Regions:
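N-terminal "arm"/small-domain region of PLP-dependent enzymes with the aminotransferase-like
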Residues: 1-30, 34
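Acidic/polar N-terminal loop/beta-strand segments that form early-domain functional surfaces
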Residues: 24, 58-59, 83
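Phosphate-binding glycine-rich loop
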Residues: 29-77, 91-95, 100-103
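Conserved coil-to-alpha-helix start sites within the AMP-binding
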Residues: 84-89
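ATP-dependent adenylate-forming carboxylate-activation enzymes
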Residues: 103-112
Length: 112
């Protein structure tokens, strides 16, 4: 295990992103508004070859849905990186499986 601190990434957001967020907030439809449906439609048509997709409220929810769709559940063990956000292990536990943490390579940030 490394004792060296690995800094997390800083998001890069510009005027376009700020304007889009402002429009959503001003609409009052933050969870299931037209922008969410437009995103789901565009994502499913351009990224996942027309397979239906659903936007969720958090990374934890996204990981949880992915685990359930993959059949991961009680009695399973899932290897997860030790350098990660809490959602990684929490979503595994929420699915009924056991998260098993493994060290990451400090250069590549991949499982070591």
């Amino acid at each position: 295990m490394t004792a060296q601190f690995i800094p997390p990434a800083k998001p890069i957001l510009g005027d376009d992103e700020r304007k889009a967020v402002d429009e959503v907030i001003a609409s009052g439809m933050v969870a299931q508004g037209p922008q969410v449906h437009a995103f789901e439609d565009e994502f499913s048509s351009q990224v996942v070859d027309g397979v239906h997709c659903v936007a969720v409220n958090s990374g934890t929810s996204a990981l949880h849905i992915g685990l359930l769709a993959s059949g991961i559940g009680e009695g399973d063990e899932v290897i997860v990186p030790s350098f990660t956000f809490a959602a990684t292990g929490n979503s595994v536990a929420l699915s009924g499986a056991k998260p098993v943490f493994a060290d990451v390579d400090p250069v590549t940030f991949t499982l070591d």
